[in-house]
Amino acid sequence: MGTGASSIAGPDGEGGYRPGLEDLPEACVACVLLHLDPPEICRVARLNRAFRGAASADFVWESKLPSNYGYLLEKLAQEEDGGGHQRRRRAKRLGKKEIYASLCHPNPFDGGTKMFWLEKYKGGICMSISSKALSITGIDDRRYWNYVPTEESRFHTVAYLQQIWWFEVDGEIEFSFPAGVYSLFFRLHLGRVSKRLGRRICNPEHIHGWDIKPVCFQLSTSSGQQTRTQCFLDGPGNWIHYPVGEFMVENSDVLTKIKFSMTQIDCTHTKGGLCVDSVLIFPSGVRPEKVFVHDR
């Protein structure tokens, strides 16, 4: 016993070795990491080897993935023309951490007209639906509408309205959402955006008619949920997320069909000067990023 004690004791008889974080079993560390958000897991992985190993454990990251992540991977595999089998094989070789990271990037589907990604802190599903995936009254008549290229859209194109009497934009999506509450927004901009000599310019030339009558926003789901709200469009020069409403998903194993629209069909006056970028779906409580705000 004395020999064993002397091998641990320092020259003054005091313990020369003190347990530290690096002595924690990797399995214990992994159990602690289950209670952290993904960005926090990545930060503590830098502490030492035990934390680094635990931060790569599949069971840690599987707990962060949405319950329908298999559906998401299959959705992406179907997007690859003739390469779906290769993507499925690659996904099987990936660890859960790599799968989480790949799903946090924008993932286009339906021919690139829609995309989804994971909100990195809680792993909730976020979605963006481009103007080209929407049904817009008069979109094929260039007297009324044009598609305008811009860097201010995830899809690099927005639908620009010059002038119209009957304003109606409709869309729908059928998707397997994890159980939870979601918010839906239209991302709109009054004025045509362009760049001149590297500077952002908003042309207000065609803006009119939006202060006379409000725009009606509507949302309905295959489970019978409905919301309706009205709002005047304002804030020229800014991208604004106009809330349409919330919907609840109770069963992630069942596809949820969502229909949404915005209309201003009072034909006593024309309206124009509006950019329609996309429709956004976010987990309730997660605010869409506020970007491209014009300096007034």
Each predicted region: which residue ranges?
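Plant-skewed but cross-kingdom recognition/interaction modules and surfaces
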Residues: 5, 23, 31, 49, ...
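Residues at structural and domain junctions
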Residues: 17-18, 37, 172, 230
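CRL adaptor-proximal regions
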Residues: 1-34
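Basic, Lys/Arg-rich alpha-helical nucleic-acid-recognition elements, primarily the DNA-binding modules
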Residues: 18, 30-31, 35-37, 41-45, ...
